[in-house]
A protein has these predicted regions:
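Glycine-rich phosphate-binding loop signature in dinucleotide/nucleotide-binding domains
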Residues: 2-4, 119-120, 170-177
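N-terminal helical cap/lid subdomain that shapes the substrate entry/recognition surface
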Residues: 3-108
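Conserved SAM-binding loop
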Residues: 17, 126, 180-181
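Short alpha-helical
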Residues: 23, 105, 131-133, 186-187
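Short acidic capping loops at alpha-helix termini that bridge into adjacent secondary structure
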Residues: 41, 144-147, 174-179
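A short, structured active-site edge motif that brings together acidic residues
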Residues: 44-45, 144-156
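Substrate-recognition element of Asp-dependent hydrolases with the DxDx(T/V) motif
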Residues: 91-104, 110-140, 148-151
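Conserved Lys-Pro-Asp/Glu-containing loop-to-beta segment of HAD-superfamily phosphomonoesterases
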Residues: 157-186
Length: 187
């Protein structure tokens, strides 16, 4: 089924296509079990994600220098580990944990659905995640896109309307010809 007037689909991937929570919880639980630490992996994952988005707001306001999601996640991780004090990780272990964002699994059915949608639409990523995260997770899940747009290369971050407008322009379409696909209402 083709939606009249829509030529391209831009996908949020962190949560919509890839299960960030499951990846983080699983890895934090594994590390916690190895250390015999008492860490609520679900809360840790939530705190990490929230802290990253708070830091992103500081980047957007100019209070922090420009940095991509890899650097934002790594910065946020230090604060979250301090909050969940029973998990002790060296700098190199923290760097390795930060790489879990590059190995998020796709939700069941997502890969097949996107491949099917590519038959009718240009399908791309439009994300605040880094280009490297989007590429690595796509490869990890054998997921092909027509393009990947990371806000790290744009002048604006989602949910700023100009990020969506710039994405449409990069695709050669008017904004009304591009549909954002996301599982949260802010997009």
């Amino acid at each position: 089924m083709k939606i009249p007037g829509i030529k391209a689909l831009t996908f949020d991937v962190g949560g919509t296509v890839f299960d960030w929570r499951g990846a983080i919880e699983s890895e934090v639980q594994r590390l916690s079990d190895e250390q015999g630490a008492d860490v609520d992996a679900r809360q840790f994952a939530t705190d990490w994600r929230i802290r990253m988005f708070k830091d992103l707001e500081l980047v957007k306001s100019g209070e922090l220098p420009p940095m991509n999601a890899d650097a934002l996640h790594r910065r946020a991780l230090d604060e979250v580990i301090d909050k969940h004090g029973s998990l002790e990780l060296s700098v190199s272990e923290r760097d390795e944990l930060n790489q879990i964002w590059h190995r998020m699994k796709a939700w069941p059915g997502a890969v097949d659905a996107i491949h099917k949608l590519r038959e009718a639409y240009t399908t791309t990523v439009l994300t605040v995640l880094s280009y490297a995260i989007a590429v690595d997770c796509s490869k990890f899940n054998d997921l092909s896109w027509d393009g990947i747009m990371s806000c790290e290369f744009m002048d604006h971050y989602k949910i700023d309307p100009q990020a969506y407008q710039q994405g449409a322009k990069l695709l050669g379409h008017r904004p009304d010809e591009v549909m954002m696909v996301a599982t949260h209402t802010v997009d």
